[in-house]
UniProtKB/Swiss-Prot annotation:
Its main location: cytoplasm. Keywords: Cytoplasm, Protein biosynthesis. It comes from the Bacteria. This is Ribosome-recycling factor. GO terms for biological process: translational termination. GO terms for molecular function: ribosomal large subunit binding. Responsible for the release of ribosomes from messenger RNA at the termination of protein biosynthesis. May increase the efficiency of translation by recycling ribosomes from one round of translation to another. Residues 138-185 are annotated as: Disordered. One of its GO terms (cellular component) is cytoplasm. It is found in: Cytoplasm.
Amino acid sequence: MANEVIEKAKDNMKKSIAVFQKELGGIRAGVANASLLEGIKVDYYGVPTPLTQMSSVSIPEARVLMVTPYDKSSLDDIEHAILASDLGITPANDGTVIRIVIPQLTGERRQEIAKQVGKLAEKGKIAVRNVRRDAMDTLKRQEKNGDITEDEQRSLEKQVQKVTDDATKEIDKLADQKSQEITQG
């Protein structure tokens, strides 16, 4: 039962890291990436709909995204949703598709994005620490109920701490890689 606590903590920390990686994928580094548009919701007949569910996104050139809506009547709504996002990109609507040229990043914009990566990393670490706290609370409860001894509790808490440290290092490593990718262009 105690090993289940460790395994559950590992699993939940891996999920937290996966969420962090997905969020990092949405941060642009001066090249076209379809995941850049994943978080955008379009008001489609009064229902907020993910852009990726109502259009196909292709990359015809290194710094160009092309959005082709399945329903041409939603073209203007898609354009407005992209403009309303805080991605710093401007869509060009030609009546059938929307082209988005990803601008070169300025030094100032690179620093802003690097700060955004830092905030995401902190959010990921908080999620990992919450998993750690839950695991520690479970171990304390088990010791209090007599399911495990005090020595077992201490040993398991050390294991949870090691898993937490490893997850935190992984998040730091991913954040550093993304920051370098952004600042070096």
